[in-house]
Amino acid sequence: MVIRVYIASSSGSMAIKKKQQDVLGFLEANKIGFEEKDIAANEENRKWMRENVPENSRPATGYPLPPQIFNESQYRGDYDAFFEARENNAVYAFLGLTAPPGSKEAEAQAKQQA
């Protein structure tokens, strides 16, 4: 399973750049393997992302903005969903991955199952 993060390398928006760096930095720091897919430099990436963000997750007007997160081709969410999962120590579940033993998320899951 590969986590794919759709980003825009040449975004003029500081807010988008900050959100992208936040997601990528978290994945790197936690040694979660991922691929960056640049929608600014690759039209195929842009088209695929726009077509695969579910209708109910799209903005009322315009296109979905990066970062958008997928596990293989399964949509996992945008930055706001990622941020909420991180705040709740549930990023691995959000990404569709198993939390590593000893992580806060694994401990929380063990308590829930007990």
UniProtKB/Swiss-Prot annotation:
Q: Does the keyword Cytoplasm apply?
A: yes
Q: Which GO terms describe its molecular function?
A: protein-RNA adaptor activity; SH3 domain binding; ubiquitin-like ligase-substrate adaptor activity
Any single GO BP term: positive regulation of cytoplasmic translational initiation
Quaternary structure annotation from Swiss-Prot or TrEMBL: Monomer. Interacts with PFN1/Profilin-1. Interacts with ERBB2. Interacts with ATG12. Interacts with BECN1. Interacts with translating ribosomes.
Q: Where is this region: Required for interaction with PFN1, HER2, and ATG12?
A: 54-71
Protein's recorded name: Adapter SH3BGRL
Where are the residues of the annotated region Required for interaction with HER2?
Answer: 13-50
Pfam families, sorted = SH3BGR
SUPFAM superfamilies per record: Thioredoxin-like
Q: Which gene encodes it?
A: SH3BGRL
Please report the organism this UniProt entry assigns to the protein. Bos taurus (Bovine)
Q: Which family does it belong to?
A: Belongs to the SH3BGR family.
Gene3D superfamilies in the cross-refs = Glutaredoxin (3.40.30.10)
Short sequence motif named SH3-binding, residue ranges: 61-67
Domain comment from the record reads as follows: The SH3-binding domain is buried in the tertiary structure, and it therefore unclear whether it directly mediates protein-binding.
